[in-house]
Amino acid sequence: MENKSLQPPLPRSERRIRVLHNDVTIDSYGWLRDREDPDVLAYLEAENHYADEVTSYVAELKADLIAEIEKRDSCDGAPPPFQVGFFFYFQKSQSGLLHSAWWRRPVTGGPEELVFDPNTLPGAEVFYSLGALEPSDDGRYIAFSFDLIGNERYELRVRDMTNGREIWRDPSRAGRLVWAADNRTLFFTRERADRRQHDRVVRLDVETGRSEVVFEEVNERLALVVRRSGSGAYLFIDVIITSDMSSRIQRAAAEVWCLPAERPTDMWRRILARELGHEIYAEHWGNEFLFRVNDTGPNLRLVRTAIDDTSPSRWQEVVPHRAGITLEEIHVLEEHVIVLEREGIQPRLVAHHRNGRVGPSIVPVEHSCTVTVGLSAGGSYSCARHPYRVSALTYKICSFVTPDIFIQHDLLTDKSKVLYRTLVSGFEPELYEARVVMAKAEDGVEVPISIVARRDRGEDGPVLLNVYGCYGAQSLPAFFGWPSSMTARLSLLDRGVAFGIVHVRGGGELGRAWHEAATRDQKRLTHTDLIAAAECLVEHRFASRDGIVIEGRSAGGGTVLAAAVLRPDLFRAVLAEVPLADIIDTELDFTLPYALRETAEYGDPHLANDYQYLRSYDPYYNLTPDRRYPPTYIDAALHDSQVLYYQPARYVAQRRSKAVDRDPDLIFRTRMIGGHMGVSHGPGVAEEAAFRMAWILHRLGQSGR
C-alpha cells in the first residue's frame, strides 16, 4: 500500500525577482543551482528518501519485472564483427564481469586477441560509457575513449597493439576519432571546457607524441565533426549545425573541408563555402564527391561533382528533391551509392549504380521500423562502417516486434541472406501486433503514432505514449535501446498495456519540414500534437479515457510536462526523465551547455516576442495553485551535462510549493552516479526500467503481480 502519511520535502524559499520585457517573475529556488552546497545535496537526498518510501509498495512487482527483463536480456550469440584492415573486431561478454570486452581476430584466420577491456578501468564498476573505438588500418594502434562519470566528457587513449602499452592519454573531452591512411596520424575533436561544443580538430602523431590544433570554429552555434569517407581515401571536417539532429548519423553541415587521407600533414581544403541556410553532407566516390544538399528543398537531393571543382555550377543531379520523401543518408560502395530515404515514416534503401542504373530497392515489410547501414562499435562517437570494395550491402533492421536482424543483400543478384538474427528468450513475436495510427492535429495535419500491443488485447485499454519532438531528431520503433526498450516494454504489453511513439512535429521522422513546423513561435504544436494523439486513441477506442500515461526524456520530458499543464485531465500519469523543465531560464544563461542551441528550437527569451511565446507554455512558469496535475515521476542526474539536475529539481520544488498538500503524487529521484543517459550497466539498468514499469502499472490500477 502507498504510504500516505509521509510528508513530501520542500526546500527553503529564497525569493529572487526578475523583470524582463515588463514581466515580473519570482524565482524561489534558484539557489538549487549550486551542486556543492550541502543544503542542495540534502534536499536531493530528502527527495530520494521520500521517493523510496512512498513507492515501496511496488517492491514485489518490481522484483517480478526485473526477473522478466533479465530473462529477455539474455540473448543468444553475438552480432557480426566489423572489419577494419586485416582484422575483425567484436565484443564478448565475460562471466562475472560487468562489461563486454573488445577483441579481434585476423581476417585470414588465427587466434583472438584482446583489444580493450573496460573492466580494468578504475571506477568502471560504478559507471562506464564508451565514446569511440577506432583501429588504425594496419591494426597496430587502437584509439578509444570513455566516460567514467556520466558527464559525457570522454577521455582519449591510444594503445600500441604490438606490446599492449598505452602510448597516449588525453583527458580533455575528446569527440569523434579518425585515423589517417599513414597509420600513425590520429585526428580527433576536442570540446570547449565551458560548454558542450567540439570546436577544435587536433592532429596527433602517435609515434612522436606531438599534437596540434589544425582547425578551430569560433561560431558558438556550430561545432566540428571529423570523419573518414566511406572509400577511406579522404578525411572530412564537417562544421555542423548543433541545433539540427535530423539525421541519426549524418549531421547537416554548414561547411565541409577535405584532406586526402594519405597526406595528413597537408592543408585542409574547403569544398563548399559557408552560406546562411546552406546544409550539406559530403562523401567521396571514385573520382567524384557526392553532396547531399538542401539547395532546392528541405527534403534534400543528391548531386555529384568533380573533386577538383566543387562549385554548384558543376553539380550533376543523381537524386532530385521530392515532396514527401526525405533523403536521410548516403553510403558508398565501389560501384554503388546506397540512399536511405523515408516516405512518410516508411524507410527504404535504394541502390544507384555508377552507370546510372537505379535499383534494386529494399523496402522493409514493416511500415514503421529502424534501418541502419553498416556496423559500428556502438559508442557515442563511433562511426558506422561498411566495406567499400564489395557488391553486397550489409544493414540492420529492427522494430517493436523484430529484434535486430543483420542482413546482407547482393546488389548484383538482388538476393538477401540473414547474417545474424537476435534471439530474445521467451519472446514470441506472433503474439504482438504493430501498426501505425494517424491522429488529426488541431490544425488538420495528420500525426502518425507507431503503436504495438498484444493481439488478444481488447478495446479501451491502457496505453503508454512516448514522445520527443525536438531538434528534428527521430524517435523510431526499434527493439533495443531508447525509446522502444522492448525487453522492458513487453512486461507492459503482456499485462494489457499498449505502447506507442507519437511522431509529433518538431521531430524529424517525416523530414525537415516536419521539424521546422514546430520550432520557435510554433513550438506549442509539439504539445498539442501529443494531446491530439491521445484524444484520437480514445475516440477510436484503442485507449480508455482514464488509461493514458505519457513519458518523455530530456526535451521530450519537457514536452510531456507542457502537455500535462495544458490538459491535466487527459493523462492518468506522467513520466519525465531528465526533463527540460524550464526553457526560459536555460536560454537566458548562455554559459550553460546547449543554451545557444536551444534558441534555434525554442526562440530567444532575450527577444520580447520570443519571451512572451515561451512564457505561454514553459512548464516551470505555468504551474498554478488551482490545478491538480497528474501523478508524475521525474528523475534527474547530478552529473548530467545536458539537462542540469537543478532544472527538474526547481520544477519539483515549484510544483510542491503551489499545492496545498505539496503534491504527494509527485515523485522525484536524482541519480548521484551517472549522467543524462542513466545507469550505464549491470543490474541497475533492469532495476530502473522495472521501477518505471511498476510505477506505471500501479498508476493504471494494475498493482498485482
From Swiss-Prot:
Pfam families assigned:
Peptidase_S9, Peptidase_S9_N
> Tell me, which GO biological process terms does this entry list?
proteolysis
| E.C. numbers | 3.4.21.-
Protein origin, superkingdom: Bacteria
Which keywords has UniProt assigned to this entry? Hydrolase, Plasmid, Protease, Serine protease
GO MF, one annotated term:
serine-type endopeptidase activity
Q: What is this protein called?
A: Uncharacterized peptidase y4sO
Which organism encodes this protein?
Sinorhizobium fredii (strain NBRC 101917 / NGR234)
Source organism phylogeny = Bacteria, Pseudomonadati, Pseudomonadota, Alphaproteobacteria, Hyphomicrobiales
